[in-house]
Amino acid sequence: MSNTPIELKGSSFTLSVVHLHEAEPKVIHQALEDKIAQAPAFLKHAPVVLNVSALEAPVNWSAMHKAVSATGLRVIGVSGCKDAQLKAEIEKMGLPILTEGKEKAPRPAPAPQAPAQNTTPVTKTRLIDTPVRSGQRIYAPQCDLIVTSHVSAGAELIADGNIHVYGMMRGRALAGASGDRETQIFCTNLMAELVSIAGEYWLSDQIPAEFYGKAARLQLVENALTVQPLN
């Protein structure tokens, strides 16, 4: 046990950055409502950073902050602010001004190629081959998510498609984030804090005991979450 009441440690978190391209709060509010409706499991009440670098017109920051907060998103900071007056308004509200890392120079565009003939659509998959640590949030939009290592407690996996975890699953797994009720979750060692498919969820104490710590497959059957052995 530490002898001091506090301890400072470096850490990193995965946050969504909302780039504002419109200075009208009502327009931003509606655009965010539409976006949240597409992936509520990922975006509802999510902490976000607002990037204001693209705003050229004067901004009513109080109204803008209220418009964003009214959607349920939690603004934890602002980046890309170069206007001194706007920066003062933001800081007056108690929000930190965040400095982003330097952006890499864009790569030259590849030479145009003739379109391939008779191509077959491919379903993309996001692959994570490193451990997912506590505090990390990984989202796979419009595709499946495969993790080949362990997922720590406090980590969160979100996918619009299926989720596969080939390691110990101690965090949270939310498949079908955009509402697809045909998605499934596959784990080789199910010890999750929460599992969810299209909004139907179990907390850890709701996972049947005979499947806890075992290889398991979860899916919806008649709109109810079910689990079976993963053979």
From Swiss-Prot:
Species this chain originates from: Escherichia coli O6:H1 (strain CFT073 / ATCC 700928 / UPEC)
Family, per entry: Belongs to the MinC family.
Keywords: Cell cycle, Cell division, Septation
General function of this protein: Cell division inhibitor that blocks the formation of polar Z ring septums. Rapidly oscillates between the poles of the cell to destabilize FtsZ filaments that have formed before they mature into polar Z rings. Prevents FtsZ polymerization.
Cited NCBIfam families: minC (TIGR01222)
Lineage of the species this protein comes from: Bacteria, Pseudomonadati, Pseudomonadota, Gammaproteobacteria, Enterobacterales
Name of the featured protein: Septum site-determining protein MinC
A Pfam family per the record: MinC_C
GO biological process: cell morphogenesis; division septum assembly; regulation of cell division; regulation of cell septum assembly
InterPro entries per the UniProt record, alphabetical: CAP/MinC_C, MinC, MinC_C_sf, MinC_N, Septum_form_inhib_MinC_C
Subunit structure as annotated in this protein's UniProt entry: Interacts with MinD and FtsZ.
Gene: minC
Residue ranges, annotated region (Disordered): 102-125
